[in-house]
Amino acid sequence: MGQTALARGSSSTPSSHALYSDLSPPEGLEELLSAPPPDLGAQRHHGWNPKDCSENIDVKEGGLCFERRPVAQSTDGVRGKRGYSRGLHAWEISWPLEQRGTHAVVGVATALAPLQADHYAALLGSNSESWGWDIGRGKLYHQSKGLEAPQYPAGPQGEQLVVPERLLVVLDMEEGTLGYSIGGTYLGPAFRGLKGRTLYPSVSAVWGQCQVRIRYLGERRAEEPQSLLHLSRLCVRHALGDTRLGQISSLPLPPAMKRYLLYK
């Protein structure tokens, strides 16, 4: 796995690598992704919900795929069948680059988030009930109309990540974070402060006849014991705080311990 970022705090606003320098993966993510994937029945159990989508969306293959009908001036969304309030969850979204259009947003939503709008927009993330990453524009949306939306992942001004066909969504309901992973590298937290909610996989789309697939990769619960090494590392990093993590390399510690504390 690549280096990752987890944000701290209680606000469900977008987070930024520039603001949160704690580059660490959610505990258990590597183990989750290394485990055998759920069987086809479980995949469908966690797939798109044909009863919880815009009227312009057709869910296919028992929930593994949906197709948006070519309706003009409409943005259409869909939720997954299962909502998550506990545990660490990951799922793969497959969305061809040529089928994204002007607004292709991937993320999560509560059961109250709207699933259709009579115009083209980043519907997912447009109000307080959803959180999304526009994989075409590289912007994060929550309670947003698109103005001054933060870039994700954070980088030099004007630079934007090209998101390939497949990406992973990583929802950690124990820490209350939502992030994304591409090519085996977790990009860090996009949103934080999500604890206490029930959130469903969701996307919103504008491209006529686009087909978006979902593949649930599994769950890891907090009840599964964390290693003493990992807990010790968290305690040390928490004691130092974000502003002093850069001083780890100057501490009188063995090189191997310094590397471990820095996730190297």
From Swiss-Prot:
Pfam families: SOCS_box (PF07525), SPRY (PF00622). It comes from the Eukaryota. Its main location: cytoplasm. One of its GO terms (biological process) is proteasome-mediated ubiquitin-dependent protein catabolic process. GO terms for cellular component: cytosol; SCF ubiquitin ligase complex. It is found in: Cytoplasm; Cytoplasm, Cytosol. Residues 1-18 have a biased composition (Polar residues). Residues 26-221 form the B30.2/SPRY domain. Residues 21-34 have a biased composition (Low complexity). Component of the probable ECS(SPSB2) E3 ubiquitin-protein ligase complex which contains CUL5, RNF7/RBX2, Elongin BC complex and SPSB2. Interacts with CUL5, RNF7, ELOB and ELOC. Interacts with MET. Interacts (via B30.2/SPRY domain) with PAWR; this interaction occurs in association with the Elongin BC complex. Interacts with NOS2. Substrate recognition component of a SCF-like ECS (Elongin BC-CUL2/5-SOCS-box protein) E3 ubiquitin-protein ligase complex which mediates the ubiquitination and subsequent proteasomal degradation of target proteins. Negatively regulates nitric oxide (NO) production and limits cellular toxicity in activated macrophages by mediating the ubiquitination and proteasomal degradation of NOS2. Acts as a bridge which links NOS2 with the ECS E3 ubiquitin ligase complex components ELOC and CUL5. Belongs to the SPSB family. This is SPRY domain-containing SOCS box protein 2. It comes from Rattus norvegicus. The lineage of its organism: Eukaryota, Metazoa, Chordata, Craniata, Vertebrata. The gene is Spsb2.
